[in-house]
Design a protein with these regions (language model features):
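N-terminal pro-sequences and low-complexity stem/linker regions of secreted or lumenal proteins
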Residues: 2-5, 10-23, 30-496
Length: 496
């Protein structure tokens, strides 16, 4: 698939049309992404706003004694569409988006071209952050194999620690306390990515050490030319360079946090109880429930090949009753809704995450060995970021070409593209601390106290009223969309 096939159309509508009584929303958007940090709660207050960062022990989830917020009074977009990819850090996807020569005048961008970033390899070599090199079909599937993404692996990546040392030989669910976390109040050094990748590689390959090329790929990332769709949208609209995952771990807990402001104390997908722990979780309300209570519309779109919605499964205790309703629909319905102007007030899009991936996830799964032309080839599940690019292209164009007079259209719909977690790929920015959900909070799974956020992930806001070249430096995290919807519609908060 050539870049010409996937780059957003050059005939995109003007980003800053002259105000008219029917379309002027600049007072709300301020020509800056999601209405900037005033709309999506950020900064120190942002960390506090996501107080229930993944936890439930010692905390009353979805408290009903919280009053509804006052709806906003300034006109703005009426529809929000979120597309969430999988397992890529900000630096891995967008770290090279701008250089000193291409940076918009007066802007700041916390990317890789503005510093000297590296990790040490186990043999003492300096491995610098770099742009991927090699054949296109190989580069588009890097890093391969998939990095470690569970909480203990993230600890090694952030702090460079493996504690106890025996954890290096175990899979995450078998590891022991303190699960590679430092035993003091150390701050993240961001120097353990190569170390952890070597550990994970050797475990997956049953003791075989990676070559320098294999081990160094964890410090690699994509150039803008390699990701023409994401890069074009990030430059032509707004990019957030400090948007953090809610939990320093993997998919389920971060996707749970995104819509419920809690991961029920979990930091792994299936450790400590298996996948059933999500089905048996407390019936904690989500933002979907708040929208339903307010008489507003919402819909989760997922691929037909996926068979079930992961969002629906993660929040089964409160969303199962909607599984067989119009609230959960295939992607074909999304394109129909966008075309006919019937997108809901809030839409969440899931890519294919199990079969024939278009979610950007690095190749993962059991390693397979094959002999081809006498050479042993070891690989895992096929995954290619170009498939994710194609999905973003299609989702964006469906909104861009929506021109209905009533309902949703290109002028009143905001598209947010983000990712659930960094997935073990390199990022140079240490995640900030966060406010634990309760003064007497007890440790959750693997002893985590939910006092720090996950790593940076890509986040791009696309709106007809967003000025090209907008870079939002304010601190955001996965609780920000809930905050936006709550303030936009006067919903009852999910937590304090």
């Amino acid at each position: 698939m050539s870049s010409d096939d996937t780059t957003p159309d050059e005939t995109a509508p003007e980003h800053s049309p002259e105000p008219t009584p029917a379309t002027s929303r600049r007072g709300f958007l301020k020509a800056s992404g999601l209405g900037l940090a005033g709309l999506v709660v950020g900064g120190a207050a942002g960390a506090a706003a996501g107080a229930a960062i993944g936890h439930s022990i010692g905390y009353s989830e979805g408290q009903d004694d919280l009053g509804a917020l006052t709806p906003r009074q300034v006109a703005g977009f009426e529809h929000i569409v979120v597309l969430m990819g999988e397992n890529r850090s900000f630096d891995n996807m967008l770290g090279w988006l701008y250089t000193a020569e291409t940076l918009p005048q007066g802007a700041k961008f916390d990317g890789l071209a503005f510093g000297d970033y590296s990790n040490k390899s186990p043999d003492g070599r300096t491995v610098k952050a770099h742009v991927y090199e090699g054949p296109t079909d190989v580069v588009m599937g890097k890093p391969n194999p998939d990095p470690g993404e569970e909480y203990p692996h993230v600890n090694t990546q952030l702090f460079g620690t493996v504690d106890p040392a025996s954890n290096a030989e175990l899979f995450a669910e078998q590891m022991h306390y303190p699960y590679n976390a430092p035993r003091d109040a150390s701050k993240p050094t961001m120097d353990g990515f190569v170390k952890d990748y070597h550990i994970n590689f050797e475990r997956l390959h049953k003791g075989k050490e990676p070559t320098n090329e294999e081990g160094d790929q964890i410090m690699g990332g994509f150039s803008p030319e390699m990701l023409p769709v994401l890069s074009t949208l990030a430059r032509e609209f707004a990019v957030f360079d400090h948007w953090y995952a809610g939990v320093p771990s993997q998919t389920y807990c971060n996707r749970s946090f995104f819509h419920a402001s809690t991961s029920h104390g979990h930091v792994t997908n299936k450790g400590a109880g298996g996948y059933s722990k999500w089905l048996d979780a407390q019936p904690t309300p989500t933002v979907f429930n708040r929208l339903e209570e307010a008489g507003l519309t919402w819909r989760v779109y997922f691929d037909e090949l996926q068979l079930i919605s992961l969002t629906g499964m993660i929040h089964a205790p409160v969303l199962e009753k909607y599984w067989a309703t119009e609230r959960f629909a295939y992607m074909s319905q999304y394109y129909k809704d966008a075309r006919e102007g019937t997108l809901p007030d809030y839409a969440f899009i899931e890519p294919r995450m199990v079969y024939n991936h278009n979610d950007f996830h690095p190749p993962f799964g059991a390693l397979r060995e094959s002999v081809i032309d006498g050479e042993v080839v070891v690989d895992s599940a096929v995954s290619d970021v170009r498939a994710g690019e194609a999905l973003v292209h299609d989702v964006y164009n469906a909104i861009k070409h929506s021109a209905t007079d009533k309902g949703s259209n290109a002028l009143n719909t905001l598209l947010l593209i983000t990712f659930d977690e960094h997935g073990g790929t390199y990022d140079h920015v240490a995640p900030p601390s966060a406010t634990p959900p309760h003064p007497n909070t007890q440790p959750g799974e693997m002893g985590f106290t939910f006092d720090r956020l996950g790593l940076r992930v890509p986040a791009i806001a696309v709106s007809a009223y967003t000025r090209a070249g907008t870079i939002i430096n304010d601190e955001m995290h996965h609780g920000s969309v809930i905050s936006t919807l709550s303030r936009q519609h006067g919903l009852k908060p999910l937590n304090q």
